[in-house]
Amino acid sequence: MELVNIFLETDAGRVKFAIKNTDDVCASELINKFVELLSEYIHIDQSEFYLVVKDKDIFYFKCDRGSISIVNNEFYVFDEPLLFVKDFTNVTGVEFIVTETMPCRIIPKNNHAVISVVTNHKFYNGLSL
């Protein structure tokens, strides 16, 4: 399971948030783990953002000051070809890919940068546009 709209920015490049999904762990526990990992870089209790999780399908969750809820699928595909690295030394910030219907308000910790990138790629009748 991985986040497809939130990444770490590091001294070496962009890093994915991914957690190996095991059958004995429910999805809500994994979402909480993603939020826990993000809490090292942003103030969760003061921030509002969306988590788009991809396993076999894409699921949307909203984190509003620490309260997490599932939201309707907006059919955004988050399919831009992005480059990622595995090895890094220093985290410099967090990157959020947002859409016109997924606003965010992020309060960073410890001088971390917050980067926002907008996408409008949606899934229409079997096509990614």
UniProtKB/Swiss-Prot annotation:
This is Core protein OPG073. GO terms for cellular component: virion component. It holds the Pfam family Chordopox_E11. Induction: Expressed in the intermediate phase of the viral replicative cycle. Coiled coil: none annotated. Keywords: Virion. It comes from Vaccinia virus (strain Western Reserve) (VACV). Belongs to the orthopoxvirus OPG073 family. Its main location: virion. The keyword Zinc-finger does not apply.
